[in-house]
């Protein structure tokens, strides 16, 4: 499994990013989707982020995962929070004991030109 990046943000918050290079069959031996996804790229992204979550939180039962009204997944009765994101060959997962969010995006040259309008100095340093 090609981890691209992993970080312990603090004592309770953790994140991991995976560079997806495997076919769907690699993931389907360990995780399944509750709802079928026809688009192959999206299906692989959804499978990858769930396997990444399972590796980060091995005690979690993915069969207990449901979607909130806002589309955010959660696990029934568990005292921790998590967030998923995926984009163009990457899957990301963040976990904490309080609400947490993660979003990954591909940096396009035209967006980079206007990044100064919406990123703070530390965020700009991360993408430099």
Briefly describe each language-model feature range.
Residues 1-128:
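Core catalytic alpha/beta fold that binds nucleotide/phospho-ligands
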């Amino acid at each position: 499994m090609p981890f691209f990046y992993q970080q312990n943000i603090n004592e309770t918050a953790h994140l991991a990013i995976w560079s997806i290079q495997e076919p769907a069959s690699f993931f389907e031996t360990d995780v399944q989707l509750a709802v079928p996804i026809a688009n192959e790229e999206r299906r692989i992204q959804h499978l990858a982020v769930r396997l990444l979550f399972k590796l980060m939180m091995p005690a979690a039962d993915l069969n207990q995962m449901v979607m909130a009204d806002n589309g955010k997944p959660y696990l029934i009765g568990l005292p921790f929070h998590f967030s998923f994101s995926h984009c163009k060959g990457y899957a990301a997962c963040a976990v904490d004991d309080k609400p947490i969010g993660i979003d990954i995006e591909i940096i396009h040259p035209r967006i980079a030109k206007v990044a100064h309008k919406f990123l703070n100095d530390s965020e700009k340093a991360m993408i430099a």
